[in-house]
Design a protein with these regions (language model features):
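Amide-forming acyltransferase catalytic core, primarily the GNAT-like/NAT-type
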Residues: 135-235
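Conserved beta-strand in the GNAT
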Residues: 60-62, 67-76, 83-88, 208, ...
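Conserved GNAT acetyl-CoA-binding A-motif
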Residues: 84, 110-125, 260-271
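Conserved active-site tyrosine of GNAT-family acetyltransferases
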Residues: 129-134, 138, 279-283
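Active-site rim helix/loop that mediates acceptor-substrate recognition in acyltransferases
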Residues: 2, 23-74, 186-206
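Conserved acetyl-CoA-binding loop-helix of GNAT-fold acetyltransferases
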Residues: 86-89, 95-112, 131-135, 244-257
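A short, well-structured alpha-helix characteristic of acyl/acetyltransferase catalytic modules
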Residues: 1-6, 15-32, 154-159, 168-182, ...
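Conserved catalytic-core motifs of GNAT/GCN5-like acyltransferases
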Residues: 119-122, 139-152, 287-300
């Protein structure tokens, strides 16, 4: 099913005054597509809109018709890697070319960033979504499972530190260590944006695991309502480790963080192309809640390789 270009809508920077409406459209669009009895309840008290706009207002775009917001899209940059979403349009304006018009400015932004890898996460069961993104050179590769497990509230002995505890004068050095570790996994991969956003907005914390002075794993975690996790949950938005053993320790540390904050559920994304990490998560009790597919531009592998110990999902 193709979008017909019935409306040529102005697309520009999403304004702070429009964030409440962007959030409403986001919930209504996804809730309607998924067939929820009350679509506006989609995602509960999790926040995917204001948090991303606050992290980088220049990477948030809105489509406007008769001066009213009808859709929005967000770009995220992790150093040499960029992805977009959530891309949502008010349901009364579906199939009229608005989603297509919200993708163009994002791709222009990717080009200005000079990133080497671009992608998105979408519904694996929707031919309409797959076809839309294929028109822009994105191709479906491996499934990504959004997995969760109950948090063990028992005593955790994993030794880890938190970014929030790093003295201000040492944070640049800490971010440099994070950059060095992720760059070794994929050239130019850099999570500074996410680490800073979580800290500045008080969305959770970043777990850091060290071997002496060498960083061996990190996990950027959203915790509770108002973050991308929602009530009673800790969501590992991005986690990476140098080895299988340090990956296990990272998952322990993230669970310990969740327990310390009184949260009952640990959530993380597992890409099937990273089968070793996927299998370790399954062995540890993670189970799939739902799954989508990552679409990558030029059909490139990126860091979704069997030798990488990463959790993320690009939602």
């Amino acid at each position: 099913m193709k979008e017909s270009p019935e409306f040529n809508v102005p697309v520009g920077q999403l304004q702070e005054a429009d964030l409440a409406e962007a959030d409403r459209i986001f919930r209504l669009a996804f809730g309607t597509f998924l067939g929820l009895p009350n679509p506006i309840e989609f995602a509960g008290n999790a926040d995917y809109i204001r948090t991303r706009w606050t992290a980088d207002p220049s990477a948030a775009f809105g489509a406007y018709l008769d001066k009213g917001l009808v859709g929005s899209n967000f770009a995220t940059r992790w150093g040499s890697v960029a992805f977009f979403g959530p891309l949502t349009v008010r349901p009364t304006y579906w199939n009229q070319g608005i989603a297509t018009q919200l993708i163009g400015p994002i791709l222009d932004l990717f080009a200005s960033w000079a990133v080497s890898h671009e992608g998105l996460f979408t519904f694996a069961h929707s031919p309409k979504h797959i076809a839309l993104y294929q028109r822009f050179g994105f191709w479906p590769r491996f499934l990504t499972a959004i997995m969760s497990k109950p948090v063990n509230q028992a005593s955790h002995t994993t030794d880890f530190s938190r970014y929030s505890e790093v003295p201000l004068g040492q944070r640049e050095e800490c971010l440099g260590a994070c950059r060095e570790m992720t760059d070794a996994i994929y050239d130019g991969l850099d999570l500074e944006r996410e680490i800073r956003a979580v800290d500045a907005q008080k969305l959770g914390d970043t777990v850091l695991l060290w071997d002496a002075a060498r960083l061996i794993a990190l996990g950027v975690c959203h915790c509770g309502p108002g973050s991308e996790a929602g009530s009673d949950a800790c969501y590992i938005k991005f986690g990476a480790a140098k080895s299988g053993s340090s990956f296990d320790t990272l998952l322990d540390a993230c669970e310990a963080l969740a327990a310390a904050k009184g949260l009952s559920r640990l959530i993380a994304g597992a890409n099937a192309g990273r089968e070793k990490a996927y299998q370790q998560m399954f062995t540890r009790g993670f189970r799939t809640e739902f799954q989508g597919v990552v679409m990558q531009r030029r059909n490139e592998t990126g860091y979704n390789r069997s030798d990488t110990y990463i959790v993320d999902d690009w939602r």
